[in-house]
Regions:
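Flexible N-terminal pre-Rossmann segment of NAD(P)-dependent oxidoreductases
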Residues: 1-10
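Conserved glycine-rich cofactor-binding loop
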Residues: 8, 15-17
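Conserved glycine-rich Rossmann-like NAD(P)H-binding loop of the short-chain dehydrogenase/reductase
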Residues: 29-46
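Conserved mid-core segment of classical short-chain dehydrogenase/reductases
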Residues: 95-105
């Protein structure tokens, strides 16, 4: 994986839906990808497909974005690899655990 001189796109919620489609679109443009979601198996399958079809660099990061220590760990891994995120697709969903009336805003 070559960190320098690439445009890196970090996509959260990349294991399906809009996130998966964003990954396909950016891979088709030759961008390097960092796919982030909680479901590793789906990310890994998508990454293998994109690498094979588009010949792009793809990192897979299993991260629960509601856990700050996991977000921090991701940040440190990217720093260690000298990867700078150029484009962020902040697509991860947040499901309400309570009714809207009970949700503290």
């Amino acid at each position: 994986m070559s960190a320098k001189n690439n445009t890196w796109v970090l996509i959260t919620g990349a294991s399906g839906g809009f996130g998966e489609e964003f990954a396909r679109q950016y891979a088709a443009q030759g961008k390097s990808l960092i796919l982030v979601a909680r479901q590793f198996s789906k990310l890994d399958a998508l990454a293998r497909e994109l690498r094979q079809h588009f010949k792009v660099d793809v990192m897979v990061e299993q991260v629960d974005l509601s856990v700050m220590s996991e977000v921090s760990d991701l940040h440190h891994r990217l720093q260690e690899l000298d990867i700078q995120v150029d484009i962020l697709i902040n697509n991860a969903g947040y499901g309400l655990q309570v009714s809207v009336q009970q949700e503290p805003y």
